[in-house]
A protein has these predicted regions:
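Alpha/beta-hydrolase active-site loop
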Residues: 32-60
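The feature captures the conserved acid-bearing segment of alpha/beta-hydrolase catalytic domains
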Residues: 96-168
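Post-His helix in hydrolase/transferase enzymes
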Residues: 169-183
Length: 193
């Protein structure tokens, strides 16, 4: 199971798992195109689709606020979605790819030409809480890459977790991450830069 599904099981609060379009066995179903899970995996089309689902869920539940959480590429989408969802109170990323250009260069991959890059967007709203965590042994998204990607953000808290890598051990930390976020959101903490 994807990491985020395992983490959701540890949280008693209501939550929804939003998979990226054309992932999880649906790559050949229309309107999927290989670009939507390769070069355009973070395209405006993908982000708009996720935002539309979030808006529908907000209206169905008559919710006023939203907490976006993502691991790896899910963190990329969470940051891009927050730009369009003013209801977003906080974004949490675990090993989040917040600079897709730096990531492709680091690994020697082709640039994601059809995708948006969170690092190229203006700083997020000053009221948006951001908690970003990365494992010290993460060689998929090394800690310095995440730190550089968040330098211009107003209320970003970046933490490196000893002994963790890209996927190892996050369920152990999850209850603490949730508690920290709830406390910070409720108290108006995280003064920012």
């Amino acid at each position: 199971y994807p990491l985020m599904l395992r983490l959701m099981a540890l949280d008693p609060a209501p939550s929804v798992y939003l998979a990226r379009p054309c992932y999880n066995g649906r790559v050949t179903a229309p309107p999927c195109d290989s670009a939507l899970w390769t070069q355009a995996r973070y395209s405006a089309e993908v982000v708009d689709s996720a935002v539309a689902v979030a808006r529908r869920l907000l209206s169905q539940r008559q919710s006023q606020t939203l907490l976006l959480i993502g691991h790896s590429g899910g963190g990329t989408l969470a940051m891009l979605m927050a730009d369009q969802l003013p209801e977003t109170r906080a974004v949490i990323t675990l090993a989040g790819n917040l600079d897709t250009d730096a990531w492709t260069q680091y690994h020697g991959y082709e640039p994601l030409r059809g995708s948006l890059n969170p690092a190229r967007r203006p700083p997020r709203d000053k009221h948006l809480l951001q908690l970003h965590r990365v494992g010290e042994n993460d060689d998929t998204l090394p800690p310095p890459m995440l730190k550089r990607a968040t330098e211009t953000q107003w209320r970003a808290r970046v933490g490196t977790v000893a002994g963790y890598d890209h996927s190892c051990c996050w369920p152990q930390l999850w209850p603490i991450v949730l508690e920290t976020t709830v406390q910070a959101a409720g108290s108006g903490a995280w003064a920012g830069r």
